[in-house]
Amino acid sequence: MAEQNQRTNTPDNGSEFAIQRLYIKDLSFEAPRSPQVFLEEWQPELNMDLATKVNDLGEDNHEVVLTVTVTVTMKESHIFLAEVQQGGIFTIKNFPKEEMRPMLGSFCPNILYPYAREAITDMVVRGGFPQLYLAPVNFDALFEQHEQSEEGNSGTEDRVH
């Protein structure tokens, strides 16, 4: 069985993808209007922003950091801000160059998002607010959109999506 798993992770061309480590790089929660906000009727407006940063660590290792920022307002008043930078170190070997950008810009953030979402929802509940449901994100579509907007610009390994 272990042999079979190893073969599925390393195709005939010797390509390899491995998660080395997942970690929280930064975590922040601000609720400037608590406790007064708890006495008001709960009618929030939620805004979520996403950003991805990729750092080449050498020797086929890459750090991918997904930043998820959730801002909740009510009647134009800032209720809370929750932000997490969920990081991961990924080993990516022997993939064609044209596959590297989608792996780092879409595939890796897809792996990181559930962890970031869990950290955000946990912070919000611990802050005394109702649990948030953050919908799944189509990182493939976001990556395509980013690539189209960056067309013509020369890319670097360190970039923000």
UniProtKB/Swiss-Prot annotation:
Subcellular location: Cytoplasm
Primary subcellular site in the record, as a coarse category: cytoplasm
Gene Ontology terms for molecular function: unfolded protein binding
Keywords: Chaperone, Cytoplasm, Protein transport, Translocation, Transport
GO CC annotation, single: cytoplasm
SUPFAM superfamilies from the UniProt entry: SecB-like
Tree of life domain: Bacteria
One Pfam family recorded for the sequence: SecB
GO biological process, one term: protein tetramerization
Function according to Swiss-Prot or TrEMBL: One of the proteins required for the normal export of preproteins out of the cell cytoplasm. It is a molecular chaperone that binds to a subset of precursor proteins, maintaining them in a translocation-competent state. It also specifically binds to its receptor SecA.
Oligomeric and partner information: Homotetramer, a dimer of dimers. One homotetramer interacts with 1 SecA dimer.
Database matches in HAMAP family: SecB
NCBIfam families on file: PRK05751.1-4 (NF004393), secB (TIGR00809)
Protein family (similarity comment): Belongs to the SecB family.
Protein name in the entry: Protein-export protein SecB
Organism this protein belongs to: Coxiella burnetii (strain CbuG_Q212)
Gene: secB
